[in-house]
Amino acid sequence: MEKVYKMPGYDLHLLPTNKFKNITISLKLQNTLDEKTVAKRTLLSFMLTTGTEKYPSTQELSKYLESMYGMKLGANVVTKGKRHIININSICINQEYLPYKEDLIQQQIQLLNDIFFKPNASKTAFDQTMFERKKKELVERLINNQDDKFYYSLEKMFEYMGKGTCLGISSHGNIEDIKKIENEELFSYFKECIKNDQKHIYVVGNVDESIVHVFENCLSFEKNNSIFESVYSFEKNRKDLLEIIEKQDVTQAKLNMGYRISVNYNHQNHYAFVVFNAIFGGMSQSKLFKVVREKNSLCYYISSSYDAFNGVMVITAGIEGKDYHQTVQLIKEQLKEMQDGCFDQDDIDTAKLMIKNSMKKTSDEPLSQVAVQYNRDITEKKETNEQYLEKIENVTYQDIVDVCQNIELDTIFLLKGRNE
């Protein structure tokens, strides 16, 4: 059961469990998703875990982490509806499992403090050599992402589908914006984040309330009174279906279909939609997999996913370009069959078992536990895993039929070969 403590400038969330020998700390900086700041926030996430005043180089920091029994430190950015989140994750062995006493938790928290308040920087800028190196690395990573045609085509679909809305903003920003960022500009924005971002820290492991006092002594931020609007971003920018076909030198075409839905985490039909999605395309023996791939051999892979923050369901498939129209038609037919109730209790039971197993897997991974709890916290949903599974179990055949009636195809993006 989560315990939440109001700390100086942040909320501390404890997720006590004796499942793990490690202590996982996940610090989240969240602010409004804005096209003007995503590139800065992404580059900032690259900078924050590269060094501190005490350990200014990557090598020195790595050596220190190794001396802390292989402590791990990493950062990334994600979007959730109208939020852009910088995650800083630290994982270290629980000191209770050491043969002698050593205050690892305090050092783990102190390192987070140093990242923010004793960075490898002057009064006005990060270390210039490190800044240029991480900026170059980020640009190279985004170029590599474009070479990943699954990732590229999905990003392009969201760009078209969400033009002018949060859905259309890439969580990483674009290459040209990143190239324009200057060191002093990024450092100034870093100071803004420390002051204005809403901060949440999650701790997973065999911990008790004594850790609260360690946080009190080692980490504090300026009090933040920022108020954010709802995290949900259910914004539709047009009425008609948008179909985009792009040609590149690819051997396998990438099909992406974006649907609008009206179900979010707090909606009473959320659980029914989770079960529907599993049956339709979210599990290995889904309708889409069995019919489009196995029966008709029209794709190399196919699946559907549900984004409750943006009100979107997405179908992704790898196909031959020549099979585009036939594949789209077959997908539409499978959705129509679901809407007509052409599924049975075995399908429902299989989906519920898959969801249950997925939740069990989540509880076996500390950062997955954090992700689930964070989703609940930012949507103000008071629910345990047991309550969630009980509501999944209570979903009926009719609930599933009802929830899929108002699914609307919004955007199709196909990336195919030049000669197809």
Q: Predicted segments — roles?
A:
Residues I178-S188:
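Active-site glycine-rich loop that binds ribose-phosphate moieties when present
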Residues M1-M68, H172-N174, F187-V291, T411-E420:
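His/Glu-rich zincin catalytic helix
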